[in-house]
Amino acid sequence: MQVPNSTGPDNATLQMLRNPAIAVALPVVYSLVAAVSIPGNLFSLWVLCRRMGPRSPSVIFMINLSVTDLMLASVLPFQIYYHCNRHHWVFGVLLCNVVTVAFYANMYSSILTMTCISVERFLGVLYPLSSKRWRRRRYAVAACAGTWLLLLTALSPLARTDLTYPVHALGIITCFDVLKWTMLPSVAMWAVFLFTIFILLFLIPFVITVACYTATILKLLRTEEAHGREQRRRAVGLAAVVLLAFVTCFAPNNFVLLAHIVSRLFYGKSYYHVYKLTLCLSCLNNCLDPFVYYFASREFQLRLREYLGCRRVPRDTLDTRRESLFSARTTSVRSEAGAHPEGMEGATRPGLQRQESVF
């Protein structure tokens, strides 16, 4: 997003709009993301909603993440046409607002949902007994609803503003690439708005996610019991992959955004062309999520193989798998129950066996 001066877009803005790298890279990457993400997440959503067992908090978060990915992918065709058309928006003001809010709301929703998953896994591994009352479906649903309320509130200025801008020097109308100064009353308000988005929707979730996954991995690595070692290795590997994907996809884009905000508002320089290119990394996360679901859940793998006609999966196979995952996950429960006699009783409750995702 570029903020023009009072006389119109400056030379840096015009150069960005003429940049051939952006005109080629974004449509190509967005097309790839849409082609992989839409069928992949549609199938993932079908499996998560119709074919898997009891909906644990992890499954609820994965459903929300899959819906988020689908909504983001559904607006990419408009972005593809816009950039192929030399940044000329032809779909009107209302659709520009809808596409822009949907694009950024769903991108940040992915960040917040992955943060919720990391916290749920952190509590399940490090505090399996004391956190049991909080790791329930209703709290997961409330967390998803809360993230959407936060997002829509934070992005509400975009929904109330005409995000199109006529660039007469190029004979085009942009959508969200150039913003009007009149959108907010002062430079100070621009700074508050942009820094709030960066801190609230990225920096805090980023720190929480990195801290939770790091603590979870270290806890699993310190566990010495041989029972469930394979499941533990799988959980550690997946947590590391999810953390790497989170850092790789979302960190570059948001830190470049921070550099652009500071340089644009206070020094008159722009890194918006770099920011636009790093948006590709954020969108690539949509392609990775279906693979994360596959490796995260043994039941998801079995259902996929059944759907592809590899073999019919007996129900007792899934039940046995849940038993083995439960045994692997309760190593820390056993140690905690040793110190608290009533904890062993809690550890044998069927409610704890609901964990299937190894997020």
Curated annotation (Swiss-Prot):
CDD domains: 7tmA_P2Y8. It is found in: Cell membrane. Changing residue 30 to C: Loss of protein expression at the cell surface. It holds the Pfam family 7tm_1. The keyword tRNA processing does not apply. Residues 41-57, 110-138, 209-237, 297-359 are cytoplasmic. GO terms for cellular component: plasma membrane. Induction: Down-regulated during granulocytic differentiation. GO terms for molecular function: G protein-coupled purinergic nucleotide receptor activity; G protein-coupled receptor activity. InterPro entries: GPCR_Rhodpsn, GPCR_Rhodpsn_7TM, P2Y8_rcpt. Residues 1-19, 79-88, 160-187, 259-275 are extracellular. Glycans are attached at residues 5, 11. The keyword Nucleotide-binding does not apply. Keywords: Cell membrane, G-protein coupled receptor, Glycoprotein, Membrane, Receptor, Transducer, Transmembrane, Transmembrane helix. The chain crosses the membrane at residues 20-40, 58-78, 89-109, 139-159, 188-208, 238-258, 276-296. Barely detectable in normal blood leukocytes. Weaker expression was seen in heart, kidney and lung. Not detected in brain. Expressed in B cells and follicular helper T cells in germinal centers (at protein level). One of its GO terms (biological process) is Rho-activating G protein-coupled receptor signaling pathway. It is a multi-pass membrane protein. Residues 329-359 are annotated as: Disordered. G protein-coupled receptor for S-geranylgeranyl-glutathione (GGG), an endogenous metabolite present in lymphoid tissues. Couples the binding of GGG to the activation of GNA13 and downstream repression of AKT activation in lymphocytes defining their positioning and growth within lymphoid organs. Belongs to the G-protein coupled receptor 1 family. The gene coding for this protein is located in the pseudoautosomal region 1 (PAR1) of X and Y chromosomes. This is S-geranylgeranyl-glutathione receptor P2RY8. It comes from Homo sapiens (Human). The gene is P2RY8.
